[in-house]
UniProtKB/Swiss-Prot annotation:
Residues 19-112 are annotated as: Beta-1. GO terms for molecular function: MHC class II protein complex binding. It is found in: Late endosome membrane; Lysosome membrane. It is a single-pass type I membrane protein. Belongs to the MHC class II family. The gene is H2-DMb1. Keywords: Adaptive immunity, Disulfide bond, Endosome, Glycoprotein, Immunity, Lysosome, Membrane, MHC II, Signal, Transmembrane, Transmembrane helix. This is Class II histocompatibility antigen, M beta 1 chain. Residues 19-218 are lumenal. One of its GO terms (biological process) is antigen processing and presentation. One of its GO terms (cellular component) is late endosome membrane. Glycans are attached at N75. InterPro entries: Ig-like_dom, Ig-like_dom_sf, Ig-like_fold, Ig/MHC_CS, Ig_C1-set, MHC/Immunoglobulin, MHC_I/II-like_Ag-recog, MHC_II_a/b_N.
Length: 261
């Protein structure tokens, strides 16, 4: 390993310039769903260009650059292949992957996180229906999730038990969205049902349509008529009170001279 670091240092110093240069070593372990290592890679790069990589078939480090840097990659590989300790470590790369990853594999991959669900109306696309709903599902792990649409408690046939392809958020959680085009009627209830291993019960999000344009006009006219009638009633009532208070009011006692009845 000392020879490798010395080579990288010499390479960087020799090519130093105003733009800067970077030489780095990268090793990766490719694991399957059960956490079993399937592949091991070890590569040396210069300015993000691969120079040399470990080849498990031939048991050596071979050049990966066949352009202008090929002579450098070839010399680099020849020098590294003289390091017996490095070659021995690379030959044990796959078993080492298993020993290094298993202690924390279950804690990372066997965990679950339930999704958050929200249903909202969105702009319709690729449909003649006037309304489109979007069921947003996010923040869940693992990625497998099933989304079902229901109308008034009944499954919508074209959207029953659909497994969605989730997109990673970059924080070990996923997100996805399901769309439903429809022609709503007043009183309908649309429900997005999300099933995920992170929760024992399905998570539901409901949406109900508002009043139709005709119903909106009817309600507006009724409200305006009611308001106008109330105003007329108030005006008439106050005028009646005013006229009643200005009329003749009889006084107690006799208004005639004494002796007359």
């Amino acid at each position: 390993m000392a020879a490798l670091w010395l080579l990288l240092l010499v390479l960087s110093l020799h090519c130093m310039g105003a733009g800067g240069f970077v030489a780095h070593v990268e090793s990766t372990c490719v694991l399957d769903d059960a956490g079993t290592p399937q592949d091991f890679t070890y590569c040396v790069s210069f300015n993000k260009d691969l120079l040399a990589c470990w080849d498990p078939i031939v048991g050596k480090i071979v050049p990966c650059e066949f352009g202008v840097l090929y002579p450098l990659a070839e010399n680099f590989s020849r020098i590294l292949n003289k390091e017996e300790s490095l070659l021995q470590r690379l030959q044990n790369g796959l078993p080492d992957c298993a020993s290094h990853t298993q202690p924390f594999w279950n804690a990372l991959t066997h965990r679950t996180r339930p999704p958050s669900v929200r249903v909202a109306q969105t702009t319709p696309f690729n449909t003649r229906e006037p309304v489109m709903l979007a069921c947003y599902v996010w923040g869940f792990y693992p990625a497998d999730v099933t989304i079902t649409w229901m109308k008034n408690g009944q499954l919508v046939p074209s959207h029953s038990n659909k497994e969605k392809t989730a997109q990673p958020n970059g924080d070990w959680t996923y997100q996805t969205v399901s769309y439903l085009a429809l022609t709503p009627s007043y009183g309908d209830v649309y429900t997005c049902v999300v099933q995920h291993s992170g929760t024992s019960e399905p998570i539901r999000g409901d949406w109900t349509p508002g009043l139709s344009p005709i119903q909106t006009v009817k309600v507006s006219v009724s409200a305006a008529t009611l308001g106008l009638g109330f105003i007329i009633f108030c005006v008439g009532f106050f005028r009646w009170r005013k006229s009643h208070s200005s009329s003749y009011t009889p006084l107690s006692g006799s208004t005639y001279p004494e002796g007359r009845h």
